[in-house]
Amino acid sequence: MGVAHSDLHNDLSSSSCFGDRNILKPGLGDLPEACVAIIVENLDPVEICRFSKLNRAFRGASWADCVWESKLPQNYRDVLEKILGGFPENLQKRHLYAFLSRINSFDDATKKVWIDKRTSGVCLSISAKGLSITGIDDRRYWSHIPTDESRFSSVAYLQQIWWFEVDGEIDFPFPVGTYSIFFRLQLGRSGKWFGRRVCNTEQVHGWDIKPVRFQLWTEDGQYSSSQCMLTERGNWIHYHAGDVVVRESNRSSTKIKFSMTQIDCTHTKGGLSLDSVVVYPSSCKDQLKRF
């Protein structure tokens, strides 16, 4: 009986008239889902997915439309309509975000667009096949070569030419912000040798004599021009063509024209690989990968 009395005393000392005292200690799992959603809104998308594994409340909040709408571009409807040709109805915002964070092709697969998973900024890439390149149809000058070093699985390679000119344009509903435009180039032709990356630079010539000129224009009068000598061989480099500011007044769609030229016909140029033109939010440009 003494043992039973002792056990009863211990049970009473660890409980109260309201039940086990541990039940009275609030935890993260006791927070209302609406409150958790407010907390989760302040996290970036990667962190939201991690916190969704904590408990049921965080898992439920991680599916809330209000949370994911705050992570989508302000004009996400326009962006989706541009990519898909229409807006997908009856989809949760989380699914819309998941779709946009993947790389999506449009315009006959010559353009790809996605949103940065940390900042939700819109990024866009235009393949060499989506650009106007002088002499591209003459195989004496240019050829398209397959490669796994491009998002588009091929690049334009220049053997030799006197008049070098590349032009392009993009008409896209970029959200309000500042964007940087880059040409992704490499001096040399990369390939594989016994499974290892190699880059043949034997045909590289003419780029260290006169600089290449980059230009860009917008419909609202913005203009940028810069010159650069191409000197580094064997690596993909993003050459900055300029920046564009997208304002509230033209947020429905922004048309950007750009060019890269070296038209001094006193010498030939050759051995250049042209992959793409990329448009990144200026705040994300440090994330550009270099091969």
Curated annotation (Swiss-Prot):
It comes from the Eukaryota. GO terms for molecular function: carbohydrate binding. Residues 25-71 form the F-box domain. Transmembrane segments: none annotated. InterPro entries: F-box-like_dom_sf, F-box_dom, PP2-like. Disulfide bonds: none annotated. This is F-box protein PP2-A12. The gene is P2A12.
